Every structure is written in structure tokens, then in C-alpha cells.
């Protein structure tokens, strides 16, 4: 049997959570999810694609990456819901990655809510795949649902 102090502490934690303080929200989960996918999942999928063709020339790798970005349906590689290649400069691609998630929670503060988020990155495919986080311009934010 737990003591009264334990019950008070647990009740306080539950009340704080229902009040929204200290609890993860669907928006923060979506932000973290898209960032992780932008930093790890997409580079891994792109690296796997480029390596499967045995390409070593930076120009060949960039052309293959351009084709991959254009022809790949993002959910098919389980990366994000959609992406937009904003620009290409040589072997560098400026890409916006978008994610929309719905809360599975039946409890406040996220009950039945959904959120969208965007992560903006530059991927350099010259040798391997490197990732650079960049600020999202207004045009990227305008594309959020």
C-alpha cells in the first residue's frame, strides 16, 4: 500500500499534466518527429538509393538524387508525408519536409487534435549524404495545412 505522500505527488502530477504543464503536446511531438526524419530517415534512404547504384562522381550522385526526390513518393520510403525541393545548387539540395500527425490520445490536452510541422534542410550528396539545418523561409511555412 502506498503512503499518502505518494498519492499526493501522483495526484499533483496528473493535475499538472491535464492542465497542460509539463505534458508533451501533439504539436511538439510532430515537430520532433519531422526533425528526426529530416536528420536521419531521409539521409539514410537517400544514401541507400545512391549507394545501390554504385555512383562515385558528385555530378552523377546529384543527378540521381534529383531523380529520387522527383520520383519518390515520400510515404513509400516512410520518411515524411511530403517534401518540396526548393532549390539545387550543384550537389546541394534545399528541401522542406512536411509532416501531419493526429493525436491518438483520448485525454486532454491533445484529445482528437492534429498538428502539422515543417523541417528545412540542405542535403549535400557529393560524397555520402550530409545534412545541414536551415531556417524555413515564409514560403515553407505558407505550405503548412
Enumerate the language-model features and the residues they cover.
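N-terminal alpha-helical signal peptides/signal-anchor transmembrane segments
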Residues: 38-65
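Structured segments of extracytoplasmic/periplasmic soluble domains
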Residues: 45-48, 71-75, 126
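Bacterial N-terminal signal peptides
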Residues: 10-19
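Conserved non-transmembrane functional hotspots
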Residues: 63-80
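Short, low-complexity, disordered segments immediately C-terminal to signal peptides
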Residues: 27-40
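Extracytosolic low-complexity repeat regions of secreted or lipid-anchored proteins
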Residues: 82-145
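Bacterial N-terminal signal peptides that target proteins for export
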Residues: 1-10
Amino acid at each position: 500500500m502506498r503512503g499518502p505522500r505518494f498519492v499526493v505527488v501522483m495526484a499533483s502530477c496528473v493535475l499538472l499534466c491535464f492542465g497542460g504543464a509539463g505534458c508533451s503536446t501533439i504539436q511538439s511531438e510532430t515537430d520532433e518527429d519531422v526533425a528526426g526524419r529530416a536528420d536521419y530517415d531521409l539521409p539514410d534512404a537517400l544514401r541507400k538509393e545512391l549507394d545501390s547504384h554504385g555512383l562515385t562522381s558528385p555530378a552523377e550522385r546529384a543527378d540521381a538524387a534529383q531523380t529520387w526526390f522527383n520520383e519518390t513518393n515520400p510515404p513509400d520510403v516512410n520518411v515524411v508525408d511530403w517534401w518540396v525541393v526548393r532549390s539545387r545548387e550543384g550537389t546541394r539540395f534545399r528541401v522542406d519536409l512536411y509532416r501531419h500527425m493526429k493525436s491518438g490520445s483520448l485525454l486532454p490536452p491533445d484529445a482528437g487534435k492534429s498538428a502539422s510541422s515543417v523541417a528545412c534542410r540542405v542535403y549535400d550528396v557529393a560524397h555520402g549524404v550530409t545534412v545541414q539545418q536551415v531556417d524555413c523561409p515564409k514560403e515553407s511555412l505558407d505550405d503548412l495545412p
